[in-house]
A protein has these predicted regions:
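Membrane-interfacial amphipathic/re-entrant helices at transmembrane-helix boundaries
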Residues: 1-28
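Membrane-interface helix termini and inter-helical loops of multi-pass transporters
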Residues: 2-12, 122-136, 244-247
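Helix-loop-helix "hairpin" substructures at the membrane interface of multi-pass membrane proteins
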Residues: 140-213
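Loop-to-transmembrane alpha-helix initiation sites
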Residues: 22, 68-77, 98-102, 145, ...
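Transmembrane alpha-helical segments in multi-pass inner-membrane proteins
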Residues: 204-255
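Small-residue-rich segments of transmembrane alpha-helices in multi-pass membrane proteins
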Residues: 51-60, 103-115, 135-136, 179-190, ...
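Cytosolic-side transmembrane-helix boundaries in multi-pass membrane proteins
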Residues: 251-287
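Short loop segments and helix-boundary regions at transmembrane helix junctions
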Residues: 35-50, 54-122, 217-229, 246-249, ...
Length: 287
């Protein structure tokens, strides 16, 4: 495939340019968040919250139709509510947070599907779960760009607190009272990116764009300051190539993007210089 073929769809079609800009913006903010989720051993939280936003989005659709602000607000409230409920259960019962999320997300998913059925209005459930990056309109694009800029700004301003909270939360709590605040801000960013992403590539596919580049980057560096931009870069390249593959092969865009990210993860798992299968010496992550 020549370089012209790789860029031609974006020069010719406005919807391809919107899909590329929105997807790259989402990759640049979701990838670093995925790195922190892996460091916190909360990798499945993204998947659980992605299911958890469905009832909020379904209720918003029932009440307001296909309104971007309503869907965003509904998904955000549902996602934050689910994360807060899981944290409350953990504090009150001692159950691990991932176990609490695993118990809550099937309830949320079933509630969302039931609400869509009760609404009696036509909305393709597959589109809600798997989305279409090629259907990104101008309003959604602005939402994705704004979310990415906000997320990156918060990550830059709170990097030290997030790094300490991920690598040694007890130490952070011993020297500062802002440990719970950093954790809450991080969860808010995760939910916000999942909510804005599900409108473009679906509630389930956005988890792949958040976690797979982060997991792949883990095999190429052990420094956190390198892992964060590397995950964003891997995600952005996968968005670009996935959209090109989707365009020429007439395939769904979301799965193409995620499968390319998965292929690079498998390659990194085998050939990565840090803890890859071809290496015998493990390396810890350092700040």
């Amino acid at each position: 495939m020549t370089p012209d073929l790789l860029w031609a769809p974006f020069g010719e079609f406005a919807f391809m340019r919107r899909a590329l800009l929105g997807g790259v913006a989402l990759a640049c903010s979701a990838g670093p968040l995925g790195v922190f989720l892996i460091l916190r051993r909360m990798s499945l939280m993204g998947d659980a919250i992605a299911h958890g936003i469905l009832p909020g989005a379904a209720l918003a659709f029932w009440l307001f139709g296909l309104s971007l602000p309503a869907l965003t607000a509904g998904g955000l409230v549902a996602g934050l509510g689910m994360a807060g409920a899981a944290a409350w259960v953990t504090r009150r019962t001692g159950l691990r947070e991932d176990a609490s999320l695993a118990a809550l997300y099937p309830i949320s998913l079933a509630s969302g599907v039931l609400l869509l059925g009760l609404a009696g209005r036509k909305l393709d459930l597959l589109h809600l779960l798997f989305g279409s990056a090629l259907a990104v309109d101008t309003a959604t694009l602005y939402g994705m760009l704004g979310t990415a800029l906000f997320s990156l700004a918060v990550l830059a301003l709170s990097y030290r607190a997030l790094a300490l909270d991920s690598l040694d939360p007890l130490f952070l709590r011993s020297i500062s009272r802002f440990g719970p605040l950093a954790h809450a801000a991080f969860l808010t960013l995760v939910v916000l990116n999942l909510v804005i992403g599900f409108q473009a590539i679906g509630a389930l596919m956005v988890v792949g764009l958040m976690m797979l580049p982060a997991a792949a980057a883990r095999f190429w560096s052990r420094r956190l300051l390198i892992l964060l931009p590397l995950a964003a870069l891997i995600g952005a390249v996968c968005v670009w190539l996935g959209l090109v593959l989707s365009f020429y092969a007439s395939l769904p865009s979301g799965p193409c993007i995620v499968l390319l990210a998965g292929a690079f993860y498998l390659f990194s798992l085998v050939a990565g210089p840090v803890n890859g299968l071809l290496r015998s010496t493990p390396f810890p992550i350092t700040v």
